[in-house]
């Protein structure tokens, strides 16, 4: 059962109730709290585009608690983060794994955070193919290209050499918040909200 909390806000016209995500959006907060698929990506992208159109000079705060998900859905969010004029601050609460970790690292420099007990996990993309041998070979080449692209993205945002990223992501690579800061995935471990929130 998926229960979305409602919040009630007093206005000069009386009470108004919002689902919690709509209320957070008013404060320029987007929350990814599940695996990343096309529906989640479309929702996050639409919210980013809306917030950019409202005020491109104000930061967007992307909170992440995600086990990862579909690479191409995640890359659609990533590309949007890089495309919009608003800075995107990323904050890991709980877990940022796989594509979630890529999005965490992709926040604007100096604005990537996690909470003290967060866990970050990097690894290579997973895939599977069946069918004719030629089709399986095509899919294998495609996943290798995707792996190389993700390694380049992580190298760009963390400052680590591509070779190091490739070595570390060969298997599941878990990090504490402090380790993620040293690695370059985040800029700081938060004990309180960022100043400009």
UniProtKB/Swiss-Prot annotation:
Keyword field contains Hydrolase: yes
Active site feature: 98, 123
The record's section on PROSITE patterns has: CLP_PROTEASE_HIS, CLP_PROTEASE_SER
Task: Provide the GO MF annotations for this entry.
Answer: ATP-dependent peptidase activity; ATPase binding; serine-type endopeptidase activity
User: Organism's domain of life?
Assistant: Bacteria
What Enzyme Commission number does this protein have?
3.4.21.92
Q: Keyword Repeat: yes or no?
A: no
Q: Which reaction(s) does the protein catalyse, per the Swiss-Prot or TrEMBL entry?
A: Hydrolysis of proteins to small peptides in the presence of ATP and magnesium. alpha-casein is the usual test substrate. In the absence of ATP, only oligopeptides shorter than five residues are hydrolyzed (such as succinyl-Leu-Tyr-|-NHMec, and Leu-Tyr-Leu-|-Tyr-Trp, in which cleavage of the -Tyr-|-Leu- and -Tyr-|-Trp bonds also occurs)
Tell me which UniProt keywords the record has, alphabetically. Answer: Cytoplasm, Hydrolase, Protease, Serine protease
Q: Which Pfam families match?
A: CLP_protease
**A single Gene Ontology CC term:** cytoplasm
One GO BP annotation here? protein quality control for misfolded or incompletely synthesized proteins
Q: Where in the cell is it found?
A: Cytoplasm
Q: What does this protein do?
A: Cleaves peptides in various proteins in a process that requires ATP hydrolysis. Has a chymotrypsin-like activity. Plays a major role in the degradation of misfolded proteins.
- How does this polypeptide assemble, per the annotation? Fourteen ClpP subunits assemble into 2 heptameric rings which stack back to back to give a disk-like structure with a central cavity, resembling the structure of eukaryotic proteasomes.
List, alphabetically, the NCBIfam families matched. Answer: clpP, PRK00277.1, PRK12553.1
PANTHER family hit by this protein: ATP-DEPENDENT CLP PROTEASE PROTEOLYTIC SUBUNIT (PTHR10381:SF70)
The UniProt family comment states: Belongs to the peptidase S14 family.
| Annotated protein name in UniProt | ATP-dependent Clp protease proteolytic subunit
Organism for this UniProt entry: Natranaerobius thermophilus (strain ATCC BAA-1301 / DSM 18059 / JW/NM-WN-LF)
